[in-house]
């Protein structure tokens, strides 16, 4: 069955960071930035706390919660927010996706958006901007179409997709650590 994204999910654009009004006595929030996105996408293991930006505000802002599906409009990828990155402000380069669990599995949505030929084709067709900075428009995103398999099949595929991403991350991490160890041993031989 073919459906549009807007029929199976709700999309909430991130907060406009420049429009957040700061208040000295407001609760403090950190921002969900590229570093956090890459960690949630199994591409990085390190986040530099030195670069962290904080804001204190009483204003309503869009916060990422553990397990949320978030799409980076700049990277053109979807991730699931980790425990470590929960409670951060999503800026306007991100869109929070609340999938209808009765129709679609969140992990399968990640696979469909990131990896499926159907999702890739639509991302390429709707990307706007120069070759330097490309961006997906939220309204275009809502009109993406998806061919839905059964929920059981979605759960199986989504689980395999997440397991494969995690496995690849740890394999690359082990390879990098092994290379570091070998280079360190070689340096010690001189």
Task: Go through each PLM region and give its residues.
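Basic, amphipathic alpha-helical recognition segments used for DNA target recognition
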Residues: 5, 96-147
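Sequence-specific dsDNA recognition surfaces
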Residues: 6-20, 36-66
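Compositionally biased, charged N-terminal/linker segments
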Residues: 25-40
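Alpha-helical membrane-embedding segments
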Residues: 62, 84-90, 124-129, 168-171
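Generic structural signal for buried aliphatic residues
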Residues: 68-71
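A short beta-sheet element
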Residues: 73-113
């Amino acid at each position: 069955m073919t459906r549009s994204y807007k029929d199976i999910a709700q999309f909430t654009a991130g907060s406009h960071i420049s429009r957040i009004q700061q208040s000295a006595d407001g609760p403090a929030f950190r921002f969900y930035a590229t570093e956090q996105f890459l960690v949630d996408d199994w591409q990085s293991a390190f986040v530099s706390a030195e670069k962290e930006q904080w804001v204190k505000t009483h204003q309503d802002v869009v916060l990422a919660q553990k397990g949320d599906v978030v799409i980076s409009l700049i990277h053109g990828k979807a991730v699931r927010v980790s425990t470590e990155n929960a409670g951060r402000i999503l800026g306007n380069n991100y869109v929070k996706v609340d999938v209808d669990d009765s129709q679609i599995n969140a992990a399968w949505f990640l696979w469909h958006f990131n990896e499926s030929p159907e999702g890739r084709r639509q991302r390429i067709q709707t990307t706007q901007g120069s070759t330097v900075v490309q961006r997906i428009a939220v309204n275009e995103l809502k009109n993406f179409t998806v061919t839905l398999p059964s929920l059981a099949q979605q759960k199986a595929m989504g689980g395999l997709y997440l397991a494969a991403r995690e496995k690849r991350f740890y394999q690359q991490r082990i390879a990098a650590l092994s290379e570091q160890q070998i280079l360190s041993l070689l340096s010690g031989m001189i």
